[in-house]
Design a protein with these regions (language model features):
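Short amphipathic helix-loop junctions that connect adjacent transmembrane helices
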Residues: 8-25
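Loop-to-transmembrane helix entry/capping segments in MFS-fold secondary transporters
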Residues: 22-23, 107-119
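Helix-to-loop junctions at the C-terminal end of transmembrane segments
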Residues: 38-52, 138
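Structural signature of the two symmetry-related core transmembrane helices
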Residues: 54-69
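Intracellular juxtamembrane helix-capping segments at the cytosolic ends
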Residues: 92-107
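A membrane-interface helix-boundary motif in multi-pass transporters
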Residues: 136-156
């Protein structure tokens, strides 16, 4: 929930909390998207060294740090720096979460599309719940900073489930039908 919520509401945060004009917000989105390319390669390299699960746990801790840092951001340049970090872990977490999920699909199945449809559905539900919670906290407290800080709770829940995840050991990659 937290990752998608941060990605969807980053520009809104910059607008409401920092008063950034549209051209600076567009630059922020470009920074995030371009850096995400490098982030996906970086975390692919890291996952070869420490494994998918440990890489995901590392990225979730970085996401928690991003949420805490967002609470304290006061300048456009701090926001750009945070956007750089968001892009780096966004690219990594999107690619590694899908590849890790693929490892959980039973090797005997030929219907991979159904599994990934479920993955996409849960992602969309997470966006709705995360955005609702973000808005609800903003309404209660009057600040998007508190909402960003509250997103740490979602990442803590994610760490809880990741810690219990056991990835199957496979000699070879599953064959796709």
């Amino acid at each position: 929930m937290g990752v998608q919520t941060v990605m969807y509401l980053a520009a809104t945060f910059g607008d409401k909390e920092l008063g950034m004009p549209g051209d600076q917000l567009i630059l922020t989105v470009l920074i995030i998207q371009l850096v995400a390319i490098g982030g996906s390669y970086l975390f692919a390299f890291i996952s070869k060294r420490i494994g998918n699960k440990n890489s995901l746990v590392t990225m979730v801790f970085i996401w928690m740090g991003i949420c805490v840092a967002a609470y304290f951001v006061n300048s456009v340049y701090q926001f750009y720096a945070l956007a750089f970090v968001v892009g780096m872990v966004m690219g990594g977490i999107q690619s590694l979460s899908r590849s890790t999920y693929a490892k959980l699909i039973p090797t005997t199945t030929t219907d991979h599309a159904s599994f990934f449809s479920f993955f996409d559905l849960t992602e969309k539900v997470a966006v709705v719940l995360g955005t609702f919670t973000y808005g609800f906290i903003e309404q209660l407290t009057g600040s998007m900073r508190n909402s960003a800080l509250f997103l740490v709770v979602f990442f803590v829940v994610g760490i809880f489930f990741l810690a219990r995840l056991t990835l199957p050991k496979r000699e070879t990659a599953p064959k796709l039908a």
